[in-house]
Amino acid sequence: MATVRICVCGDEGTGKSSLITSLVKGVFVTNKIQPVLPQITIPPTIGTPENVTTTTVVDTSALPQERSNLAREIRKSNVILLVYSDHYSYERVALFWLPYFRSLGVNVPVVLCANKSDLAADHTEAQVIEEEMLPVMAEFKEIDSCIRTSAREHRNVNEAFFLCQKAVTHPIAPLFDSKESALKPAAVAALQRIFYLSDKDRDGYLSDKEIEDFQMRCFDKPLSKEDLVHIKETIQKTHPDSVTPFGIDCRGFIHLNKMYAEKGRHETVWIILRAFQYTDNLSLQESFLHPRFEVPPFASAELSPEGYRFFVNLFLLSDKDNDGGLNDAELASLFAPTPGLPASWADGSFPSSTVRNEAGHVTLQGWLAQWSMTTFQSPKTTLEYLAYLGFESSDRSNPSTTAALKVTRPRKKRKRPGRVGRNVVLGHVLGAPGSGKSALLDAFLARGFSHTYRPTIQPRTAVNTVELPGGKQCYLILDELGELEPAILENQAKLLDQCDVIVYTYDSSDPDSFAYIPQLRSKYPHLEELPSVFIALKADLDRTTQRAEHQPHEYTAMLNMPSPPLHVSATWSSIQEVFVHIAEAAMEPSTAFPRSEEDVEGKWMAWGIALGAVVCAGAAAVMIWRRVSGSG
């Protein structure tokens, strides 16, 4: 909502105070009025732009002794009503007033007002505009609009102040470059995005149905067939190729809005921009890009069913060649209404972080996995891109982009039996250099095995779906920490909050590989508070004895782990079972912790109870048999 502060300037005797009085009283005041009126505040009335709360009108004096007060009021205003009434005061507009405003360093719109039109009956409206106003407007681009008024006849008085309000609420300067006679780049970019979002079938044209939907969204009233025909005819006069049987193309849409701006109908352009959440500086509203969304400790953010539907539909619309994958051109087109790929995607080497087909194009599975990971790691990023990409909530009680997300239940006591209430889980893959961590991530994404060793410096992430026993699916994120491993493992609070499982890996053919794991757990004892999975990689090679205090199976037995290390090779097809095991450990964390003495005692007690029940049942059967035999 805007508060408009109008500073009324001009030479003495041009009728500034009379204009203000006529506005307030509704009629011309014949009595002598004071030279400078006190400041007045006008509440919103019928005809006031809808986003104006209050309007303050400030009268000023042009006398030299009042120059400091004049400068102060000009600097406080957000629009200037510059009044002239005769040839002399008109000449002073270009010679003194407009250069004076510039000298003060103010950057506010100016409404040029030719007052006392009742005294210039020999000049028509068109003559005044063409001979007086247009030359000045051409020289001084800060002039937003012009109007001819008469305070005595109460002619165009309200309209003059309405133009001032509109100059603040619907400024022309951010939209149109009068010197170049073209829309400014930021305005073109905003309108291109609006066209893209309104083109629901992504065929490059706004069909009649899409134009009607656009009309209702922006103006909340239907478009008549006559108006639609007129719009098309208007575009065809300049760009005949922009109107086709399929509809209006983007060039025609931009040209139509340029014409609105050129002809003083920039209010129409602003209505369109604001319907799509644009601010006065042509950026998207902060509350729209970053709505309030909080994730409690030990909880996580995931896409809701509506969020998944949106990204599925976006994928299907963008896969123009219907090959089941998004190539570079299709991805570029999809992200056209955004600043580009999310920074986290670029840092994570997208698209190599997710599932691709044989041609290297991102599959639907990979697309959804990538957004699931993004939402888990940075829900604010997902919300921002949902806004850029045009997500519209179907939930009237929550029209925000937050309808596409949900928050999982906090998981605090991981050792308590049961599944966690989430569908996206994160595992850190740890191990000595050369243990096979990168090959494990490649196998997770069904990539071919590479015999070339490349040490991981930058963190690397892979995300994919895993089907659990029973048919339920979850998204598993595996990351190799690279040089950031010490920093991530030292941050105990963040590690315990975000990580769901630790995957310890070692090269079963390298005698020095396993020793890294006990050293790591000793250095970061809080790792014991996370579910753990131990994996012996490179099982296709000859297994060797590890140069460690304890052999891997002895170490896991000493920890009372539920199972010894899993032996597997990235070259084996059975490696997919390892990812199911990791996902199960994350989804049911109690199964991946060392068994406590209570667990063992509980098992013996259960065996004892079961054995006792069997013995009692047997004794009872013998007693019954004897009674039956005795009675016989």
Swiss-Prot record:
**Protein name, per record:** Mitochondrial Rho GTPase 1
Protein residues bound to Ca(2+) 1: D199, D201, D203, Y205, E210
Write out the residues that bind GTP 2.
Answer: 431-438, 467-471, 537-540
Chain positions covered by the region annotation Disordered: 396-418
Its predominant location is: mitochondrion
| Listed Basic residues bias regions | 408-418
- Which InterPro entries did the record assign? EF-hand-dom_pair, EF_Hand_1_Ca_BS, EF_hand_assoc_1, EF_hand_assoc_2, EF_hand_dom, Miro, Miro-EF-hand_domain, MIRO_dom
Binding-site residues, Ca(2+) 2: D319, D321, D323, E330
| Taxonomic lineage from the root | Eukaryota, Fungi, Dikarya, Ascomycota, Pezizomycotina
Q: Which GO terms describe its molecular function?
A: calcium ion binding; GTP binding; GTPase activity
Residues binding GTP 1: 10-17, 59-63, 115-118
Q: Which cell locations does it reside in?
A: Mitochondrion outer membrane
